[in-house]
């Protein structure tokens, strides 16, 4: 399967989770084995020669692609979670959302100064969650941080929220 064919497998769900929103449902792509293999290969090909040591997947849909990417690269996977979900000592970052404030956490020992990290989430919309995760990982002083998405909604300009010196990639753009 070719990369551009993946878009045909993503379901559009109007008015979800609220009126006026067009939700891009990746589960219809993920349930197709050939599409999942294509996604895995395409994600991994971006980073194969970059020395990546950790992939951070953002709760919860970022766990799917992030785990696959870590497996394909033969590196570690680190979950970025909502508050209270990680059992050991954590560091956290609060960030603004449309209707309030949310927080993201990592184990305090998850990233070291020797790590080259890919931050992964399924979809880039406004960029707030990824920016918070980026700032949190940056505070742990890794060698390098890359940012990756399966889908990017370009009209929402989420890239503009991310640092300009950050290499951002997405497999599919709408």
Residue ranges and their predicted role:
Residues 1-174:
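PRPP-associated nucleotide enzymes
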């Amino acid at each position: 399967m070719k990369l551009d064919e993946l878009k045909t497998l993503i379901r559009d769900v109007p008015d979800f989770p609220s009126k006026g929103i067009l939700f891009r449902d990746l589960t219809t792509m993920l349930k197709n084995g050939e599409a999942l293999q294509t996604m895995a290969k395409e994600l991994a090909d971006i980073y194969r020669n970059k020395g990546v040591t950790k992939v951070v997947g953002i709760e919860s849909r970022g766990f799917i692609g992030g785990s696959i990417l870590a497996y394909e690269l033969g590196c570690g996977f680190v979950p970025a979670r909502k508050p209270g979900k990680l059992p050991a000592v954590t560091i956290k970052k609060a960030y603004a959302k449309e209707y309030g404030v949310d927080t993201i956490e990592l184990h305090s020992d998850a990233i070291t100064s020797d790590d080259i990290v890919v931050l992964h989430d399924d979809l880039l919309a406004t960029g707030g969650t990824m920016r918070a995760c980026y700032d949190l990982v940056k505070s742990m002083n890794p060698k390098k941080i890359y940012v990756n998405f399966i889908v990017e909604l370009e009209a929402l300009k989420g890239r503009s929220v991310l640092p300009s010196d950050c290499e951002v990639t997405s497999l599919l753009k709408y």
